[in-house]
Amino acid sequence: MFDAAPIKKVSVVIPVYNEQESLPELIRRTTTACESLGKAWEILLIDDGSSDSSAELMVKASQEADSHIISILLNRNYGQHAAIMAGFSHVSGDLIITLDADLQNPPEEIPRLVAKADEGFDVVGTVRQNRQDSLFRKSASKIINLLIQRTTGKAMGDYGCMLRAYRRPIIDTMLRCHERSTFIPILANIFARRATEIPVHHAEREFGDSKYSFMRLINLMYDLVTCLTTTPLRLLSLLGSVIAIGGFSLSVLLIVLRLALGPQWAAEGVFMLFAVLFTFIGAQFIGMGLLGEYIGRIYNDVRARPRYFVQQVIYPESTSFTEESHQ
């Protein structure tokens, strides 16, 4: 058996994108929750290219006396998971907790995650109770969770909730991965020996709007499908085989019917032939599109461009910053 190392310091990583209304309350509540831990702690706020005053508020919070807040400013918007990975590269804690900035997942749940991780778990996930989202968001989340569970074989109930805890070795291992499209909860579970979930409260969004539009959810679905498995390519091969066999069988049937009923019948079957042709063409375009998704993602991985560019890092009790690029 492997004994988990004791948790001496907790790092809370929070990606921020146009959350100026919620930031003061977020910082206050997260700070209060961390102070109750009885451990060393830090909060890392990552500005993901916000166009409002989020970055200024973050910098101000880092520069306050006795601040525990590290502000990381990206030069533009790279997406939630890339921003979290940028935060991971600057943490110093033994346990790292991710949290959304919209306050739908209460920061007051942080001590419960730390206590559960103290039992020896590598990853502690959460399941949102009484979700305060729209019916569309709930339905999309159920489909995504079902897809992930079927693909990975990991019976985790709520991959969409970013309130999660990871031990430092899991974080270090994820940082060594270089996929361009990264879905952190799934990647962490691949490396975790012991993972569990706990139920948490879920609140209605008080400030601003959700940053996940319909098209971003569709893109997330594509990311999950193409990053997790090659099963769609195998299904595509199976579909192609079925269509080929069906087309050959139909051709034989048409020849037999022509011989049996004469050429007049064949002329009357033109529309059926067009229908079959369009079916084949449609299947080919579906296959080409799916194949293109895989090839495009392989191309992005081969180019090995950085996931993000860190423009500034503001540490507590210091107004200095560094400029650097990270993978």
Swiss-Prot record:
Main location: membrane
Keywords: Antibiotic resistance, Cell inner membrane, Cell membrane, Glycosyltransferase, Lipid A biosynthesis, Lipid biosynthesis, Lipid metabolism, Lipopolysaccharide biosynthesis, Membrane, Transferase, Transmembrane, Transmembrane helix
SUPFAM superfamilies recorded: Nucleotide-diphospho-sugar transferases
Statement: the UniProt record of this protein carries the keyword 4Fe-4S: no
Protein topology in the membrane: Multi-pass membrane protein
Domain of life: Bacteria
Any single Gene Ontology cellular-component annotation: plasma membrane
Enzyme Commission designation: 2.4.2.53
Family: Belongs to the glycosyltransferase 2 family.
Name assigned to this protein: Undecaprenyl-phosphate 4-deoxy-4-formamido-L-arabinose transferase
Source organism of this protein record: Salmonella paratyphi B (strain ATCC BAA-1250 / SPB7)
